[in-house]
Amino acid sequence: MPHLLEKLYYNGLYGMQACAGTTAPRLSGLWVGEWNLLWRSAYTMDANVNIQVSGMNGSGLYEAGVGYMWFILRQIPDWVNNAAMVYGMKDAVLIPVNTDGHRAMMVEYDINYPFQYWNAGAGWMLIPIYEFLQTYGDAVITTFDASLIKMYGKDTFDVRKDVYEPLLKKAYNFWKQIGNPEYYTDT
């Protein structure tokens, strides 16, 4: 088992280095060495993104961690909207299973796999940010991305105060609300 975990770790690290560009690596990246394919090379949030970014902090890939922050920040407004649209929640986040990396609206609904009920997404996506803080301490990052500057009204972000803590609070609010009898009934 330790050998398998080591292989997964190095496979993820390879995917991150070979395919990430300035953001997290896409699903197809590890197969073709490309990160901006014209076909639906989605970011698969419930597995591929997390496996591929798992080695970034422990390997000292600071820039990859910063790219992951931009990837997350670009999507948070849609995550908040997803929680409101699917569950009627306020100040909470619901992460989709797949995203194009720029927007993250819930668009996949399937009777065989209930994509819209992947409730563990926020915690899953927070882990690399927590590890970034554990590895590098408090950091301030700067973007030159006009869309992020427009979205947030600034170009610098304190990773703990502007990214991690607000997202953690929204994840907490999700679980606090879903534990409410309005969403959950013990039968």
Language-model segment annotations:
Residues 1-43, 61-83, 153:
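Acidic/polar, glycine-enriched structural segments that form the non-catalytic walls/loops
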Residues 154, 165-187:
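Acidic/histidine-rich catalytic neighborhood
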Residues 2, 36-46, 109-119, 187:
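Solvent-exposed loop and edge beta-strand segments that line ligand/cofactor-binding
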Residues 21-30, 65-66, 136-144, 177-186:
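Short, well-structured active-site flanking segments
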Residues 60-63, 67-134, 140:
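Active-site lining segments of carbohydrate-active enzymes
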Residues 6-10, 47-50, 66, 123, ...:
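A structural signal for well-ordered alpha-helical segments within the folded catalytic domains
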